[in-house]
A protein has these predicted regions:
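Outer-membrane beta-barrel porins/channels
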Residues: 1-177
């Protein structure tokens, strides 16, 4: 994807209108996922996956004409995320899963405003229960995000992302008729 931008920005850093022109380039990365699963015991499934994304060939590059200190460039690195988990059928109506995922970070410092983490580690738990017409399912996932310090736009943008985590919870009820 390649695009060119022109436009006006009013009141960003001063009350005056700022006219700018930009020549921006972006790309969608190539990604490959390999998934594996096998039964390891009756009613127990082992799952694993690897997900590789070639981010280094998909950078974002925004050039602001006449204001090079405001240029924005990404520093995306190729990444590989791994996951391993177990699925278990407890009864004919109830099953659950537990998984652990991790992605190695690219470094604890970055010169790009697009960098907000340095890898991650995730623990997920899911549960499903079925009756005749009703299926209840839910899950919880906790992700610990790696720390990173960012200094971009010639030092105008600095940020320290430390001790961050994400907790996600999902619930679903479905009726069959």
């Amino acid at each position: 994807i390649e695009m060119g931008l022109t436009g006006n920005a009013s009141g960003l850093m001063a009350p005056a209108t700022l006219a700018f022109a930009s020549d921006s380039k972006m790309a969608i990365p190539k990604a490959t996922t390999i998934k594996f699963q096998t039964g390891i015991a009756e009613d127990t499934l082992l799952m694993a996956s690897a997900h590789r994304v070639n981010w280094s060939a998909a950078q974002i590059d925004v050039k602001i004409a006449g204001a090079s200190s405001l240029d924005v460039e990404s520093e995306f690195s190729d990444t590989t995320a791994y996951s391993v988990g177990l699925g278990r059928k407890f009864t004919e109506k109830t099953s659950g899963s537990l998984s652990y995922s991790w992605e190695k970070g690219a470094g604890a410092t970055s010169g790009s405003g697009f960098t907000m983490s340095n890898g991650s580690k995730t623990l997920s738990l899911g549960l499903k229960h079925q009756t005749n017409n009703l299926t209840l399912s839910g899950g919880v996932s906790y992700t610990k995000v790696g720390d990173v310090d960012v200094s971009a736009l010639g030092g105008l943008l600095t940020a320290a992302y430390d001790d961050n985590s994400v907790t996600a919870v999902g619930l679903k009820a479905s009726f069959d008729f």
